[in-house]
C-alpha cells in the first residue's frame, strides 16, 4: 500500500510517500542521515521516535520539499512524514500519541510572515521621527 501526504510550514511544502519497505528515509532523493544541520535531521526523524522504532524498519519514506528555509522545510517534512505514518498504519493510538506530543506533527502551522509596508524598515516598525 502506498500513502501520499503533504505538510506545510511558512512557504515550505513537503510531499511524502510512505510504502512498505526496509526503513529507508529519503529527503529530496538523499538519505536523511546526510541532511544538514543536524537539528533539522532530528526534527524530521521525530515521528519515528514517538512511534516505535520498529515501525521505521517496516516502511520506506520519500519526501520532496520545496520553498522556504532549512528549518521551515524540516517542519514541513516532519508533518508530512507523521501524517503518512498515521494514514499508512491507520492507527488511532499513534495519532493520539502524535497529538499529545505536539499538535503541529499532524496539523499545518498556518502562520505566515507579515509583509513589509512603506514608512518603515519592517512590517510594524516605523522609521524614527525627528521634530527639529
Swiss-Prot record:
GO terms for cellular component: cytosolic small ribosomal subunit. One of its GO terms (biological process) is maturation of SSU-rRNA from tricistronic rRNA transcript (SSU-rRNA, 5.8S rRNA, LSU-rRNA). The keyword Kinase does not apply. Keywords: Ribonucleoprotein, Ribosomal protein. Coiled coil: none annotated. InterPro entries: Ribosomal_Su5_D2-typ_SF, Ribosomal_uS9, Ribosomal_uS9_archaeal, Ribosomal_uS9_CS, Ribsml_uS5_D2-typ_fold_subgr. Residues 112-132 are annotated as: Disordered. Pfam families: Ribosomal_S9. NCBIfam families: PRK00474.1, uS9_arch. Belongs to the universal ribosomal protein uS9 family. This is Small ribosomal subunit protein uS9. The gene is rps9.
